[in-house]
């Protein structure tokens, strides 16, 4: 699983990077917010990001907002690091889109556990997405034959007719009927 570590303090960044690498993650690093933004807004963003709040270029909170504004990409779990420790700061970070918040200084074990929590949440999200796709497919097809059901066919037909109208082309539709379908239905359900 890929994790981005973005921190402008070189000692902190290298310590976090080496710890995360030791825990079995693939690590990408960014020395400032601008570099982190390029990585996070790229076509294949990392699964998780550990972002420092105060960085040159784009700060961690603004970066959270920009990442969350993209609805079309896979979800990135964001852990925000900061020396800011007040309740208002934590709330501001979470409201900006961070999934978790760690106040500096922190123990490496705390980071390890929070990353493990993020990994668990991302795995659950993947399972939920797969289940949704399965349910969507089951709802669109006849269970016995595996063929598209009436509503799905009408929906596809509507899309194809709209596309043909936009492109100025025509569509052909074939209607097929199965003789003695009642016997098939009575036999197989």
Q: Positions of the model-derived regions?
A:
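Charged docking surfaces used in two-component/phosphorelay signaling
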Residues: 14-22
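A Lys-centered signature of the CheY-like receiver
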Residues: 104
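Acidic, metal-coordinating helix/loop segments flanking the phosphotransfer/catalytic sites
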Residues: 29-48
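Conserved nucleotide-binding and Mg2+-coordinating catalytic segments in signaling enzymes
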Residues: 136-155, 176-189
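Receiver (REC) domain active-site loop signature in two-component systems and cognate sites
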Residues: 55
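Active-site residues of response regulator receiver
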Residues: 7, 52, 82
